[in-house]
């Protein structure tokens, strides 16, 4: 069967300009010239407005459409677009006006219409187009008869056939065309006089082929160039608000503000603002309110940090007023002083005031915050490579305290050693270290401390060399253990016996030698060493020395845990946590206090899945009370309390990757966590609960219905509510750590404080917070997926061994 061939041209290929020409307007009883306007709309774009004036009445209504286009003398109108640029919904908007019969300067509306350039078949209209116009309301009242409609319909049909003939769509037969044209002229002459609707004749360009609409597709650019534009005013304050603030805070209001006292409503607003956590941003209205009542607030020590946040530090007059109020303000607590050392407060006098408040802290209290205070040195006065170091008040304070306290001096030294390895701030911390060494050399006691620190550095270097040698030694674990003992006995390391040396991990302990036979190598990827040291008092001190692990994150967790333990004891709540010690001696090595214990996985394997059996064997109850499950009440109390403490604290810190191999229990029942490689909500496992509380841990308390489990939950609620009271201190400590080179803090440092704050549930009342934590416990115990993960982990450990 022969294929039908249809010749056409796609509109996207037609680059000719789209042109149109006015011909005539036919309407009844009118000889006046008409003014017509025509506008092209293509897509969402409108073209320029074209306006033409011409005589509307044609001399002979019997003329055919093909003859009308020939007698038109108007020029072609160019809309500045090509046919290829026309959209499918492109249309004309046409309106016609004629002079008024009474006043030639006034024009009357004749008609208007919209006319699509592509028909219902997506073909571009060509040749002469006959377009009826919509008339005014008066004309619309006329309703043509059915006979008139039939006549108009017939005329349109004949005109359409003539247009097809003109376009070549119908073959031409000369003798038949002459007869047909005569009949059509007679019909038009007879019936056109009855048509009352204005009709516009427009002449479109004609092409050799039908033009079918087709979208234009642009080729993909190989050389793409992206441009970014920046709004320079995007983050700027509104000038009107700035002007208002200057007027509100004008110095002329100063004398009046001194006598201002808030009413009960404003007092509640101020109390609400002062209760905000440190990370909460104050609105402009809240800042203005704090500033307005600044003199009244000087008697409230909790208001200073909020007041300093409300100061516009670019306004010298405000700065002078704010600084003058510092000395008259009620002395603030240490936790608020820590907030003033955060990156949010950069003015030297504000930071100096914070340091003056730290001077009231005891050495024991200062040790709890020392890690963060070292990090706060970053925000004092950063120095460039060509700038001379000027010690800040904080640096001088830390150095002076370190000279007077060996414990602070020990920790400060090792914190600085680690930070010096961090390239961006190496010069700053090297300068502080130089200042520390320089001040030590000024006194006999100081020189002794300096010699001790130097001996500690050499001691750690020996352990590092031994650890690297063991790691590079080829052989089984047993061979590595034998090789370790040989190295420890080697006289070149001088580790068997030496002069008393404060252990860097715990400077309160003086070690005098090592016991090689009690040392071993753990079966782990990094092959950490377990070393046992002889102490000056005859005791022994076991440690784990790790090379290849960054212990700074673990060090932070244990430091916060130790602080929380102190805070709970102040609230008369002793959870028997006994946190162990961790010290990073470098970016990739450090020491951990070894606590004799067994992992939960080992206990379950050796005691047939029973924590109770493990506790009973190591702590048998001599009494006949069956309520203790045959376990010494002290051991059971240790277990219940420490479980509660670690569950709450690890939840608050978002400790992840919890499994049965990093949950441990000592013989006397102390429960604790190890390996803090994931914190702040990060976890390599899917669907991990917010808190690790396995059913094995609960069964160690006697099960869900035992009184010990109820006691455990009570300890959890009390611990959670007690730590919520100290949330500002914890949040301030984390705000000082946001730029520390710690993996899970660097991961998303902008949200570090927010993640910790979120877990305190500070937006809840105390009763709601307890209900929330109760639900958290229930969800953790009943979670199925962690149990599956624990089983898979145990299987993986078995296969690995």
From Swiss-Prot:
The PIK helical domain covers which part of the protein?
Answer: 257-439
Source species taxonomy? Eukaryota, Fungi, Dikarya, Ascomycota, Taphrinomycotina
According to its UniProt entry, what is the function of this protein? Phosphatidylinositol 3-kinase that functions as a part of the autophagy-specific VPS34 PI3-kinase complex I that plays a role in autophagosome assembly. This complex is essential to recruit the atg8-phosphatidylinositol conjugate and the atg12-atg5 conjugate to the pre-autophagosomal structure. Also functions as part of the VPS34 PI3-kinase complex II.
Domain PI3K/PI4K catalytic spans what residues?
A: 515-785
Gene3D superfamilies recorded for this chain?
A: C2 domain, Phosphatidylinositol 3-/4-kinase, catalytic domain, Phosphatidylinositol 3-kinase Catalytic Subunit, Chain A, domain 4, Phosphatidylinositol 3-kinase, accessory domain (PIK)
**Annotated region (Activation loop), positions in chain:** 673-694
Q: What is this protein called?
A: Phosphatidylinositol 3-kinase pik3
Q: What is the enzyme's class at the highest EC level?
A: transferase
Q: Does the keyword section mention Cytoplasm?
A: no
Is Transferase one of the keywords?
yes
* Domain of life of the source: Eukaryota
Q: Which reaction is this enzyme known to catalyze?
A: a 1,2-diacyl-sn-glycero-3-phospho-(1D-myo-inositol) + ATP = a 1,2-diacyl-sn-glycero-3-phospho-(1D-myo-inositol-3-phosphate) + ADP + H(+)
GO biological processes: ascospore-type prospore assembly; ascospore-type prospore membrane formation; autophagosome assembly; endocytosis; macroautophagy; pexophagy; phosphatidylinositol-3-phosphate biosynthetic process; phosphatidylinositol-mediated signaling
Question: What's the subunit arrangement here?
Answer: Component of the autophagy-specific vps34 PI3-kinase complex I composed of vps15, atg6, pik3/vps34, atg14 and atg38. Also a component of the VPS34 PI3-kinase complex II composed of atg6, pik3, vps15 and vps38.
Identify the stretch(es) annotated as G-loop: 521-527
An MF annotation (GO) of this entry: 1-phosphatidylinositol-3-kinase activity
